[in-house]
Regions:
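Short phosphate/oxyanion-binding micro-motifs
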Residues: 1-121
Length: 121
């Protein structure tokens, strides 16, 4: 099992999509957690490119203002999904490895950048 956590500092330019696609193919990634995406939505072709054409399952949280945003994708051919939950600052996926049956939680967290939101984080 291989995966990455990456603070993308915005996910709009083609170079970042190419980097993620190449990395996903080269390292054969099974999960991708991107933080600070700055995006409210993604189209299927973008998601397909990020994971190098694999059939990933995706979940995301919108940014708060100009900062934040989380995108989390996993390969369902490697993991059985128990549940997906979202909070204001995290996405949590409960899953089980198909190979050995090990159960675990994958959690992507991105805290508030603005002082007025830090208390709720």
């Amino acid at each position: 099992m291989k995966g990455i956590f990456w603070n993308s500092r915005g996910l709009r330019d083609l170079a970042k999509f190419r980097f993620l696609s190449d990395l996903s193919k080269e390292k054969n990634l099974d999960f991708i957690a991107l933080l600070e995406t700055g995006r409210k939505n993604f189209i299927d072709t973008e998601l397909n490119n990020i994971c190098g054409g694999k059939n990933f399952l995706w979940s995301w949280i919108d940014p708060k203002g100009r900062s934040g945003g989380i995108l989390l994708g996993i390969n369902p051919s490697v993991f059985c999904i128990g549940f997906i939950s979202q909070g204001d600052y995290h996405i949590k996926i409960r899953m089980r490895n198909k190979v050995d049956g090990f159960q675990w939680n994958l959690i992507a967290v991105y805290g508030a950048a603005q002082a007025e939101h830090k208390k709720s984080f």
